[in-house]
């Protein structure tokens, strides 16, 4: 009698295949990250843009592209990238938080606060968003709320306490 069970296990070839369909993307992404670390932001932008030519919806590459643009003081392009991410995923907390930083740089603290609150709504455990909320509230002279947000950020990540001591945004707190 023959066993008619279908073989659903992976073959040895499938498990150890040397082909990585994301090899080029991953290589460009890592190179872009290293260029960012070396403060070669224009070159990093080129790497992330190459990734996006192949996959225009690669959110991870878009986040790094926007962050690089932001640090090149190309705020309008950074904002365009973050808006595109939010078109793909309106609940992306990192995009909301980074968008808040662009508004902060433009000294538009109310808009920055609105964006960072959307980041927190998307991920209530996002410590950096809570920290930034504390900064923005401080800049808007809402000291008690600023302290509450800072306290929450420190509960999530204790390193934020050390950071806040040196942060000029908390001078009036």
Could you say what each language-model-derived stretch is?
Residues 8-10, 37-50, 71-84, 105-118, ...:
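Structural signature of tandem alpha-helical TPR/SEL1-like repeats
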Residues 9-27:
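TPR-adjacent "capping" and linker segments in tetratricopeptide-repeat scaffold/adaptor proteins
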Residues 21-54, 60, 67-71:
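Alpha-helical segment of the N-proximal tetratricopeptide repeat
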Residues 64, 98, 132, 166-167:
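Canonical tetratricopeptide repeat
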């Amino acid at each position: 009698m023959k066993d008619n069970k279908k073989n659903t296990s992976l073959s040895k070839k499938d498990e150890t295949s040397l082909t990585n369909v994301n090899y080029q993307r991953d290589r460009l992404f890592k190179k872009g990250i290293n260029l960012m670390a070396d403060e070669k932001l224009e070159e990093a932008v080129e790497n992330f843009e190459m990734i996006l030519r192949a996959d225009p919806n690669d959110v991870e590459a878009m986040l790094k592209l926007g962050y690089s643009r932001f640090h090149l003081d190309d705020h309008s392009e950074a904002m365009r990238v973050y808006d595109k991410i939010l078109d793909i995923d309106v609940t992306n907390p990192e995009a909301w938080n980074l968008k808040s930083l662009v508004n902060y740089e433009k000294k538009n603290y109310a808009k920055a606060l609105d964006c960072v609150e959307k980041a927190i709504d998307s991920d209530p455990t996002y410590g950096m968003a809570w920290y930034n909320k504390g900064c923005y509230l401080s800049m808007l002279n809402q000291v008690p709320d600023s302290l509450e947000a800072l306290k929450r950020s420190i509960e999530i990540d204790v390193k934020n306490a050390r950071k806040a001591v040196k942060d000029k945004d908390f001078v009036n707190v």
